[in-house]
Amino acid sequence: MSRITTTFAKLQEEGRKALIPYITAGFPFAAITPSLMHGMVEAGADVIELGVPFSDPMADGPTIQKAGDRAIANGVGLVQVLAYVREFRQKNQTTPVVLMGYANPVERYDQIHGKDRFVDDAAEAGVDGLLIVDYPPEECEAFAAQLRARDMDLIFLLAPTSTTERMQQVARVASGYVYYVSLKGVTGSGALDTAAVEAMLPRIREHVSIPVGVGFGIRDAATAQAISRVADAVVIGSRIIEMLDGQPHEKIVPLTIDFLRGVRKALDA
């Protein structure tokens, strides 16, 4: 059983919802990522999504694109991201870590380091799941099986526009949780319509038996609390990155802890 599945089972037993913060690895400073991850856990994060910097992130809005550009300028790529996870695992062996990114860096990693090397290296580093935005579920059965053999999960996005066929395809290969993108468009865009999310989640659950996390557009504790009434997990990314942009090194971790503690308190209320 994966760390992600174990975490969600424990939360369900306790009647609690998962808090999943997202941060782009290597943003805003290259060396701060492991400390930031530990701070997130201290504040009540249940799973951490770590964005892999990429030069052409088609699903990301301006905030996360800018963070990715900064991380790349800081010299951070997939090799360094795995190093951050290894460092995090020296002190924390329980909190799941999901890498979120695109196919290109993964495929380049295997070209440079050897066929299927990325999965082996990610498992060895302590990664628990992958969310590869541009991997189509209908072509991922072998890859998903390869991950499951290493107790890793393959996570997929669903959107307001997702068809029944898409949901069924995702249900066949996904494990850990699915990530419902609550807005049309890119990350960080628009205002969240909680009623629309409430209407969509039962449709998803007709086809998907694993937990459903909701993200894109969750910017404060009140919205997170409203979404948590219908979702199994709340994902917050762009708001954290906006908050940290331009802040000095010494404020990065305390600001993140303070913000996430407020969200955690709202989820547990």
From Swiss-Prot:
For this UniProt record, the keywords arranged alphabetically read as follows: Amino-acid biosynthesis, Aromatic amino acid biosynthesis, Lyase, Tryptophan biosynthesis
Describe which pathway this protein belongs to, using the record's wording: Amino-acid biosynthesis; L-tryptophan biosynthesis; L-tryptophan from chorismate: step 5/5
Q: Name the catalysed reactions.
A: (1S,2R)-1-C-(indol-3-yl)glycerol 3-phosphate + L-serine = D-glyceraldehyde 3-phosphate + L-tryptophan + H2O
The catalytic site is made up of: E49 (proton acceptor), D60 (proton acceptor)
Q: Which InterPro entries match?
A: Aldolase_TIM (IPR013785), RibuloseP-bd_barrel (IPR011060), Trp_synthase_alpha_AS (IPR018204), Trp_synthase_suA (IPR002028)
Domain of life according to the entry: Bacteria
SUPFAM superfamilies, alphabetized: Ribulose-phoshate binding barrel
Molecular functions per Gene Ontology? tryptophan synthase activity
Q: Does the keyword Protein biosynthesis apply?
A: no
Protein EC: 4.2.1.20
Top EC class, one word: lyase
A GO CC annotation recorded here is:
cytosol
Summary of subunit composition and partner proteins: Tetramer of two alpha and two beta chains.
UniProt lists the family membership as follows:
Belongs to the TrpA family.
Sum up the protein's function in the record's words. Answer: The alpha subunit is responsible for the aldol cleavage of indoleglycerol phosphate to indole and glyceraldehyde 3-phosphate.
NCBIfam families named in the record: trpA (TIGR00262)
Q: What is this protein called?
A: Tryptophan synthase alpha chain
Q: Which species is listed as the source?
A: Delftia acidovorans (strain DSM 14801 / SPH-1)
Lineage here is:
Bacteria, Pseudomonadati, Pseudomonadota, Betaproteobacteria, Burkholderiales
